[in-house]
Amino acid sequence: LNDSANTTRMPGKYYTLEEAKELVAFCKAHHMTLIPEIDMPGHSAAFIRTFRHDMQSPEGMKILKLLMDEVCETFDVPYLHIGTDEVQFTNPRFVPEMVSYVRSKGKKVISWNPGWHYKPGEIDMTQLWSYRGKAQKGIPAIDSRFHYLNHFDTFGDIIALYNSRIYNKEQGSEDLAGTILAIWNDRLVSTEWGMIIENNFYPNMLAMAERAW
């Protein structure tokens, strides 16, 4: 997966296992919750190029479980995000089986909404990414629907973020877990620092924090 031949953006850019562990330690020292995301089964073209198997195939699921073993061992954190957005599901067993497997490793599981449709108890938390995403009673939701930064979108305007309300509610609840401000560079930015600058990350982060306290 780390081979530059299998990636289309920023070849050779990845975290080593030691760097990943250092990042976990840094976040803990600064009282932040790190949530690793391993996109499945969508946004996984590099997986297919590397292993020559679709994630939803029996062979792909075997490989993915081995990767989850390594991820769960490397990241000493409570949550793991599994994606499940923007994909056609061809294997109805895929998501339930992967959620169960990650939970068996002692992790709570987060999934995008819209994505796979869960009932209470089938997932630990969802993250709303589109106006079509709806919080479900009994499943805590993170509201990121209009709280993401992309220098081609207007949602990340600092004034709009400051004046927004998380899920249009005055305060959180057992079903509303807050917000995450995400940088989604659908248009390629050449460097990591360029992403921070072009998306006006720090001012926007502070504005959104005022809504989330």
Model feature map: region roles:
Residues 69-71, 115, 167-169:
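Generic recognition of flexible, low-complexity loop/linker segments
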Residues 1, 116-121:
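Beta-rich nucleic-acid/ligand-interaction surfaces
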Residues 31-35, 79-81, 108-110, 123-127, ...:
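Structural preference for beta-strand elements that scaffold enzyme active sites
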Residues 38-44, 86-88, 115-117, 130-132, ...:
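Active-site-proximal loop/turn and secondary-structure-junction residues that shape catalytic pockets
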Residues 1-105:
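Substrate-binding cleft of carbohydrate-active enzyme catalytic domains
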